[in-house]
Regions:
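A short, flexible loop at the N-terminus of ABC-type nucleotide-binding domains that lies
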Residues: 2-6, 13-26, 59-62, 77-79
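Helix-to-loop junction immediately C-terminal to a conserved catalytic motif
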Residues: 55
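Conserved ABC transporter NBD signature motif
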Residues: 63-74, 83
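Conserved ABC ATPase "signature" region
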Residues: 119-137
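Conserved ABC ATPase signature
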Residues: 141-145, 149
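Catalytic Walker B motif of ABC-type/P-loop ATPase nucleotide-binding domains
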Residues: 166-169
Length: 283
């Protein structure tokens, strides 16, 4: 059976035990296999709750009719461990994920838990550290790494166990712009090379702008879901819920207002620069 959607939520409702009102209310969305989807919204909108539901750390309200499907499996208490093998999460603070004395030990941790033979484990650790540009640090202590380097190691640890889906839960929010850009470029490359599905939970509009699809969450409900261009061209809607607009989308909006029509497939700074140069050369 061919699975087209890596993640699907149908009428998902969730209420925390100490809360009287649900934090998620009849949520419906799909994440296509092999795509990058960004989930954005203000604090308390329910973004991180969704990531915990996908990984089975939380379960939807009983008798609510909620259905969560991950990699073709309907999530329940019996198959939660099977689903967790399909999903890896990179959290905001990588220090909370380190368990090994060295970078190599840390990346090997998940493999050891799965009983992978040592020879295979050594090769896998070297391969995934090379994938994220951290092989030279295999014997380093995680505490001595920069924030960006720590996140690379965290990503390597996830890659080692070969998930189908990677959730970036505010995983670039503590990095400087340079470190953030490096991590996102690595993720984009690995997504293509390994056919990964990426769900990015973020406040960073520039990170969201790199996605194939954007879901806007507001007060436990989905406000909109479309391509980044479609979402951010609606300049008022993101601002109403406290989100800014990516610089390139602001610029495209202003150019369109001035009568310079920018094609919808122009989405990045480089694409806009190239289009404007071509436009200028025709004059």
């Amino acid at each position: 059976m061919t699975i087209s959607n890596a993640i699907e939520f149908k009428d998902v409702t969730f209420t925390y035990p100490e809360s009287q009102a649900p934090v998620l209310k009849k949520i419906n969305f799909k994440v296509k296999k092999g795509s990058w989807t960004a989930l954005i919204g203000h604090n308390g909108s329910g973004k991180s709750t969704i990531s915990k539901l996908i990984n089975g750390l939380l379960l939807p309200d009983k008798d609510s009719g909620s259905v969560i499907t991950v990699s073709g499996m309907n999530l329940n208490s019996k198959n939660v461990w099977d689903i967790r093998e399909k999903v890896g999460i990179v959290f905001q603070n990588p220090d909370n994920q380190f368990v090994g004395a060295t970078v190599g030990d840390d990346v090997a941790f998940g493999l050891e838990n799965r009983g992978v033979p040592r020879d295979q484990m050594v090769q896998t650790v070297k391969k995934v550290l090379s994938d994220v540009g951290m092989l030279d640090y295999i014997d380093a202590e995680p505490a001595n790494l920069s924030g960006g380097q720590k996140q690379r190691v965290a990503i390597a640890g996830i890659l080692a166990v070969e998930p189908e889906i990677i959730i970036l839960d505010e995983s670039t929010s503590m990095l400087d712009p340079s470190g953030r850009d490096q991590i996102l470029k690595i993720i984009k490359r690995l997504m293509s090379e390994k056919n990964l599905t990426i769900l990015s939970i973020t406040h960073d509009i520039d990170e969201a702008d790199m996605a194939d699809n954007v879901i806007v969450l507001n007060d436990g409900k989905i406000l909109a879901q479309a391509s980044p261009t479609e979402i951010f061209s609606q300049t008022e809607m993101p601002r109403q819920i406290g989100l800014d607009i990516p610089f390139v989308d602001k610029l495209i909006y202003k150019l369109n207002q001035l009568g310079i029509t920018i094609p919808k497939d122009v989405q990045t700074k480089d694409e806009l620069k190239q289009y404007l140069c071509q436009l200028n050369s025709k004059k």
